[in-house]
Regions:
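Single conserved hydrophobic/aromatic residue that forms the stacking wall/gate
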Residues: 1-7, 11
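Short strand->helix junction
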Residues: 4-5, 54, 160
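Metal-dependent nucleotidyl/phosphoryl-transfer cores and adjacent nucleic-acid-binding surfaces
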Residues: 8-9, 15, 34-43, 57-64, ...
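Metal-dependent phosphoesterase core characteristic of DEDDh/y 3'-5' exonuclease domains
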Residues: 9, 16-47, 72-182, 188, ...
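Conserved DEDDh/DEDDy metal-dependent 3′-5′ exonuclease domain
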Residues: 44-129, 282-350
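Generic detection of long, well-ordered alpha-helical segments
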Residues: 58, 62, 87, 164-167, ...
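Acidic two-metal-ion nuclease catalytic site recognized across multiple nuclease folds
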Residues: 176-307, 404-461
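Substrate-recognition/cap regions that form aromatic- and gly/pro-loop-enriched pockets
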Residues: 312-418
Length: 461
């Protein structure tokens, strides 16, 4: 079964389907704005939602996430799909779960797998042109935006990005791919689990996959060399290149060659749902067709039979890692940014359910059991948002000042800040005045008033 999702700071939408993508159940909830959170102004406008509407919701963010997690547990094992979900929604969900004292990797462990319909749509159109209809931008490239693709492909989904429309549209695109490009759909089923994906890449003599950059999908017929020493991603040789000169190169020369364009070694991120096709698909493209299957196989065997080359490539990558470590910024990460800095321990993971099950007045005792300081911080931050009177004055002030520092920052941060939001409001106001859109201007005024109140409250911290 599949679960298709979309998420933000104030809503969570998920639809459960069977293997034929027919809906079985759904989760659709909207919550109050959490203290110190500024949603993107444009996201609120697209959703026709104002801060005053969100203030009226009875559900807090913490309660919404609790309901959501319980729903996923009830649904059981599933494949989680979305549109650009692996790069965006999944990362957003992981960080949200991490900060809500839930296990962050719920969608890719315990028999669950994940896939991305955006990368699938690009692969389908590359190998089976016109599987999906796209609008074209001024550079002549296909546009892969859900709100534009859905109507072009006859998908009825209500208003894209509103209510649950974007989730329904994603399922509609998935259905079209499964019908019109079934081989791409079948291939995608084999790489939704990262371990299965890695096994497939290592086992095949050669395979065809695609990458998307500068607005276009490009095919690559490749063979596995070795895994990246730090990230474990498969490093593969692009077989349009003759491997002979590279196999003999001393390490210094190979290091220099690996920095040049075009790249002869490519990274396949096996944990991000690559679409691995039969190498015969490469014959659709001149750069591989002209070389021919026989020669491509010979080149693949040369790589596979040369362990010394694999060791050299691995060594070059290890040197790159050391170099990066030395030049790495020494700036401290905020707790909220530290999800990948280190994994939470098994012991701490076992304490998380206890935090959720006890009454609010007992949660501080549970927080003190966490060994990981980040989890202690998140626990206290949840109390700050839900039951601030339980916190000591000192703990309240630490979190209050921390939120204030983040919100008032004038740096280019990974989160929304007050100065950035004012700037976005000014830009949007000029746009909507020009387009004569009073409804949108009204929401904008509401957002502006909300941000002014936030600024007053946190400026005194």
């Amino acid at each position: 079964q599949f679960a298709s999702s979309a998420a933000s700071d104030v809503y969570k939408r998920q639809v459960l389907t069977n293997d034929n993508l027919d809906e079985l159940d759904r989760f659709d909830a909207r919550c109050r704005l959490s203290p110190g959170i500024i949603p993107e102004a444009m996201a609120l406008i697209v959703n026709k939602t104002s801060p005053s509407m969100l203030k009226k919701s009875n559900l807090s963010h913490y309660e919404m996430i609790r309901q959501f997690v319980e729903t996923l547990k009830r649904w059981g094992k599933a494949t989680y799909i979305g549109f650009n979900s692996i790069e965006f929604d999944e990362e957003f969900l992981r960080c949200t779960l991490f900060q809500t004292l839930e296990y962050p990797y719920i969608t890719s462990t315990n028999g669950n797998t994940r896939g991305d319909i955006l990368s699938l749509a690009r692969a389908a159109n590359l190998y089976y042109p016109n599987t999906l209809k796209n609008s074209v931008n001024e550079k002549g490239n296909d546009v892969y935006k859900l709100d534009q693709m859905a109507p072009l492909n006859g998908i009825e989904h209500g208003d894209a990005h509103s209510a649950i429309g974007d989730v329904i549209a994603t399922i509609g695109i998935a259905k079209l791919i499964s019908k019109k490009a079934p081989n791409v759909w079948k291939a995608s089923m084999l790489t939704m689990d990262k371990n299965q994906s890695l096994e497939l890449i290592k086992k095949e003599l050669l395979f065809c996959t695609n990458e998307y950059f500068y607005g276009r999908s490009r095919p690559y017929v490749q063979t596995f060399i070795c895994q990246h020493p730090q990230y474990q991603w498969p490093l593969c040789f692009d077989l349009r290149h003759d491997p002979s000169p590279y196999l003999k190169m001393p390490i210094k020369e190979l290091t220099a060659a690996m920095k040049k364009q075009p790249k002869f070694i490519r990274t396949v991120r096996h944990n991000k749902h690559p679409v691995i096709m039969n190498p015969s698909y490469g014959n659709q493209f001149d750069e591989y067709k002209l070389i021919g299957t026989k020669k491509l196989e010979e080149r693949a065997k040369m790589i596979k039979n040369n362990e010394a080359f694999a060791e050299k490539v691995s060594s070059v990558k290890r040197s790159e890692i050391d170099e990066k470590e030395q030049t790495k910024s020494q700036e401290d990460l905020y707790n909220e940014e530290s999800i990948y800095a280190k994994f939470t321990s098994t012991e701490d993971n076992k304490i998380m359910p206890e935090f959720h099950s006890v009454d609010w007045n007992k949660k501080l005792q549970v927080i003190s059991k966490f060994k990981d300081e980040r989890l202690q911080y998140f626990g206290k931050k949840l109390l700050y948002m839900e039951k601030p009177e339980i916190l000591t004055k000192s703990d309240f002030n630490i979190i209050h000042k921390d939120i204030s520092k983040k919100l008032l920052s004038t740096n280019n941060e990974n989160w929304n800040t007050i100065p950035r939001t004012y700037s976005e409001i000014d830009t949007l106001r000029a746009k909507f005045e020009k387009e004569n859109q009073p409804e949108k201007l009204k929401i904008l005024d509401d957002i502006n008033a909300y941000v002014e109140d936030l600024e007053k409250y946190y400026s005194s911290a």
